[in-house]
From Swiss-Prot:
Keywords noted in UniProt: Notch signaling pathway, Nucleus, Phosphoprotein, Repeat, WD repeat
Pfam family, one: WD40
Protein name per its UniProtKB record: Notchless protein homolog 1
PANTHER family listed in its UniProt record: NOTCHLESS PROTEIN HOMOLOG 1, WD40 REPEAT PROTEIN
Length: 486
């Protein structure tokens, strides 16, 4: 009734009308076609759509026609897109994050302690802990309630190049320049188990088995400049299997949610492996130079596991519940972002291009994304998987449609290479760190700069946004770790 009433109320005015049909992102139709005035606003569409969905609590929704969001009215969007309106017009509806992350605006702590550059920073899955890896060979944990140093972890004998949290937040893996991997307990700062050795050159990336696949968080995969990928049993402290096939250094690695491992290399290829036995499924080819970076559409759900950012409290907690409960929560969060189709993968290269793939299904790319004028440093899917952001040496960040790879916008403001980017948990904001020594926070929907954050004395190598939305952490050449809040 409410749907009919909202449509009828608009019908009393003498306005051009259109026949429209709602459908979700997967193409599932909602209700039957109905006619609306051409000047209908998103608020009115929201009333009609929520009535058709029969939700107890109305959902915040966004509406799209041919990939363009309806911002002021349907008519305005149609004019800008020059859309044919003779037949039924499909309007795609998408639920939006119910919670909001506010932009960080100021540096609340400048934490000294590292004696060389900070190479990586990473918040734990709930945002309770912050870890950093440095050229001074140490890993450090920082106390976020007091924003002070907590533990200094010594054990590596060379630069710590890569760090990665287990999705239950109970272990941190770190990899260094001499090929060694160590595991740490964030609550004590002590090393867990023995060093994992076997790689002959430095560690380029670490990726844990997803929580919904194994709530014990027992297995971690590593990639190395030696061209191999290894899967480790962290409980037994041994290498479970070695995946070989790349002809050059493996630059990045992802452990996907559907039982696949993805590795990208300087040999210009991405290889897709079956995680449980190491069988090579397919090789993705297309890049004309080194593949530097890749991301999965499900990365954020995999990283945060059973943690739901919408339920975050002011003081981050550990995850509670039995292993089975955590596994089920992680699986439902993964399935929600994965949607109907398999997870998508985006890769970025020294050849200035990105490719979008559906690696579980096909070795042909879904899209080739061009526009950057220099090599691509990092690429990241938004937590809701709808937008891809890429950071480049051309000083820009570009936004792309997460389903089609279509170009959306360029974010300009940095005056030197953009090294790293991180999304807020609600997918509305993006923070970037640059060689120009600044961080910048961007409003993704408005496609403009929200806040400029100077403060570092030199290049910013690493940046992360806590999954609870409270803080941004950054580190770089000035050896200083900075925490930013709203």
């Amino acid at each position: 009734m409410a749907a009919a009433a909202a449509a009828d109320e608009a019908a009393t005015r003498d306005v051009q009308r259109l026949l429209v049909q709602f459908q979700d992102e997967g193409g599932q139709l909602l209700g039957s076609p109905f006619d609306v005035p051409v000047d209908i606003t998103p608020d009115k569409l929201q009333l009609v759509c929520n009535a058709l969905l029969a939700q107890e609590d109305p959902l915040p929704l966004a509406f799209y026609v041919h990939d363009a969001e309806i911002v002021s009215s349907l008519g305005r969007t149609l004019e800008s897109q020059a859309v044919e309106t003779e037949k039924v017009l499909d309007i795609i509806y998408q639920p939006q994050a119910i919670f909001r992350v506010r932009a960080v605006t100021r540096c609340t702590s400048s934490l000294e302690g590292h004696s060389e550059a900070v190479i990586s920073v990473a918040f734990s899955p709930t945002g309770k802990y912050l870890a950093s890896g440095s050229g001074d060979t140490t890993v450090r944990f920082w106390d976020l309630s007091t924003e002070t140093p907590h533990f200094t972890c010594q054990g590596h004998r060379h630069w710590v190049l890569s760090i990665s949290w287990s999705p239950d937040g109970k272990k941190l893996a770190s990899g260094c320049k001499n090929g060694q991997i160590l595991l740490w307990d964030p609550s004590t700062g002590k090393q867990v188990g023995r060093a994992l050795t076997g790689h002959s050159k430095w560690i380029t990336a670490l990726s844990w088995e997803p929580l919904h696949a194994n709530p014990e968080c027992r297995y971690v995969a590593s990639s190395s400049k030696d061209g191999s990928v290894r899967v480790w049993d962290t409980t037994a402290g041994r290498c479970e299997r070695t995946l070989t096939g790349h002809a050059q250094s493996v630059t990045c690695l992802r452990w996907g949610g559907d039982g696949l491992l993805y590795s990208a290399s300087q040999d210009r290829t991405i290889k897709v492996w079956r995680a449980h036995d190491g069988v090579l499924c397919r090789t993705l080819q297309g890049h004309g130079h080194w593949v530097n970076t890749m991301a999965l559409s499900t990365d954020y759900a995999l990283r945060t596991g059973a943690f739901e950012p919408a339920e975050a409290s002011v003081n981050a907690q550990d995850l509670r519940g039995s292993l089975q409960e955590l596994k089920e929560r992680a699986l439902s969060r993964y399935n929600l972002v994965r949607g109907q189709g398999p997870e998508r993968l985006v890769s970025g290269s020294d050849d200035f291009t990105l490719f979008l793939w559906s690696p579980a299904e096909d070795k042909k790319p879904l899209a080739r994304m061009t526009g950057h004028q220099a090599l691509i440093n990092q690429v990241v899917f938004s937590p809701d998987s709808r937008v891809i952001a890429s950071a480049s040496f051309d000083k820009s960040i570009k936004l792309w449609d997460g389903r089609t790879g279509k170009y959306l916008a360029s974010l300009r403001g940095h005056v030197a290479a953009v090294y790293q980017i991180a999304w807020s948990a609600d997918s509305r904001l993006l923070v970037s760190g640059s060689s120009d020594s600044t961080l910048k926070v961007w409003d993704v929907k408005a496609q403009k700069l929200s806040t400029d954050l100077p403060g570092h004395a030199d290049e910013v190598y690493a940046v992360d946004w806590s999954p609870d939305g409270q803080r941004v952490a950054s580190g770089g050449k000035d050896k200083c770790l900075r925490i930013w809040r709203r």
